[in-house]
Swiss-Prot record:
Keywords attached to this entry: Disulfide bond, Glycoprotein, Immunoglobulin domain, Membrane, Phosphoprotein, Receptor, Repeat, Secreted, Signal, Transmembrane, Transmembrane helix
Originating species: Gallus gallus
A single BP term in Gene Ontology: regulation of neuroinflammatory response
A GO term from the CC aspect: external side of plasma membrane
Pfam families in UniProt: V-set
Protein name: Cell surface glycoprotein CD200 receptor 1-A
Keyword field contains Iron: no
Signal peptide: 1-24
Keyword Iron-sulfur listed: no
């Protein structure tokens, strides 16, 4: 019985292996920011294809295609992860602009009448080291080195007095920046030396004084143009302001009096005087008559 049980187990195991036809794990790598493609087992008369993605961080992603219904499905997958072409004739998976979060295990399962066939991948994202040497806006040499995980070491020839600055990023890279700050180069071009497990590179640069002279010349010209423009605006405002100030004022209006107005003003006074005289004469005559003896009349 024990031997029969073992035989059954072996038979079942062989059947499962035959049906699943799983291959070994294929280790692949992709450069950060580049595209990568993974293919499925080549089989005929496929009825269904499924990609199962298990990243180190995040949720599982699934892409599926059914031949009989000519339909595709996508679950929890980024827009960057998709079929390379039409899945009915090309079942390859393409990842655009690979990031560190895409690291993990990728499995393609192909189903046909002969069984299920698998191909497994383990994706590793590589950050290619990068070195850059340039002159800043002040004509000083600047050296940059971008590497993965550990920071690179930067040194200068001649020796520089500056301290490098290291910045860590979310994608797992570290950027080191160093400014050349030596007092004298003895006529030699500054040389930047980058040391790292994945990068050993040396570059030289000449940030000559002509570069700084060019910047200074441009600054002087711009300043001169700004001053000229400012003076022109002031002159324009002053010119138009004086025009408004010197506009001819309306002449002072001198009141004029006509002889008719004088006559109108004098006539009331004359009438008044005449009335006074008449009243005075009447009173005088009455008084004189009262003082005369009876029978006499005042002389005229």
């Amino acid at each position: 019985m024990e031997i029969a049980g073992k035989a059954v187990c072996v038979f079942l195991l062989l059947a499962i292996i035959k049906l699943r036809r799983s291959e070994g794990i294929n280790r692949v790598s992709a450069n950060l920011g580049h595209n990568t493609v993974m293919t499925c087992p080549t089989r005929t008369n496929i009825s269904m294809v499924t990609w199962k993605i298990n990243p180190k961080t995040g949720h599982q992603c699934t892409l599926a295609y059914r031949i009989d219904k000519d339909s595709t499905g996508k679950t929890n997958c980024s827009d960057r992860i998709n079929w390379r072409s039409r899945p009915d004739w090309d079942q390859a998976l393409e990842i655009q602009q690979v990031g560190k979060a895409d690291e993990g295990n990728y499995t393609c399962e192909v189903v046909n009448a002969d069984g299920n066939f698998h191909r497994l991948y383990h994706l590793t994202v590589i950050v290619a080291p990068r070195m850059a040497l340039y002159c800043d806006d002040y004509g000083n040499p600047v050296c940059e080195a971008e590497t993965e995980k550990s920071a690179a070491e930067i040194s200068w020839v001649p020796e520089s007095n500056s301290t490098p600055r290291a910045d860590s990023h979310d994608n797992g890279t570290v950027t080191v920046v160093s400014w050349f700050a030596a007092r004298s180069t003895n006529g030699k071009n500054p040389t930047c030396i980058v040391s790292h497990a994945t990068l050993n590179e040396t570059k030289s640069i000449n940030c000559s004084s002509s570069y700084r002279d060019l910047i200074l010349c441009i600054a002087i010209i711009l300043s001169f143009l700004i001053i000229i423009t400012f003076m022109a605006v002031i002159y324009y405002l002053k010119l138009h302001g004086c025009r408004f100030c010197h506009r001819s004022k309306p002449p002072d209006i001198i009141p004029t009096y006509s002889s008719q107005d004088d006559t109108v003003e004098v006539e009331p006074y004359t009438t008044y005087v005449q009335k006074e005289n008449v009243i005075y004469n009447s009173v005088s005559d009455l008084t004189l008559r009262q003082n005369l003896p009876q029978g006499q009349s005042p002389a005229t």
